[in-house]
Amino acid sequence: MADHPDDRRYTKDHEWARREGDKLRVGITAYAVEQLGDVTLVDLPQLHTKLRAGAHFGDIESVKAVSELFAPVSGEVLETNSELERNPERVNESPYEQGWMLLLKPDSPSEFDALLDASAYAEFLASLSH
């Protein structure tokens, strides 16, 4: 299983968020990608959409399934990764870098702080295999 970068926080729905100044970059984890298989489509929200922590914000389709994407924190969508429209496989190739999905302006920094750190996420994944 892939390592989980410790410069970001994680959710139990397998999304990650990385702080970039006063913004957060969001994507899905390597574990999620592993479960999905080859990604064929990523459906993301419009710019300036307001998201609520834990709420559905888009969908990701793969050869195996269609899965919902959930916001790790509340905030406003400032940017989406338009590269994923043309090349959804970027999510498979690089879930933590080129496969990012959203850039958010978070409503509250405390929501980010409440997410799982890399070691807590790794422990959560270990609990899934038992």
Predicted features and spans:
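Short, conserved catalytic or interaction motifs in soluble domains
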Residues: 62, 82, 106
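Short, conserved beta-turn/loop elements at beta-strand boundaries and strand-helix junctions
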Residues: 19-22, 80-86
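ATP/adenylate-binding site constellation spanning eukaryotic-like Ser/Thr protein kinases
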Residues: 71-74, 118
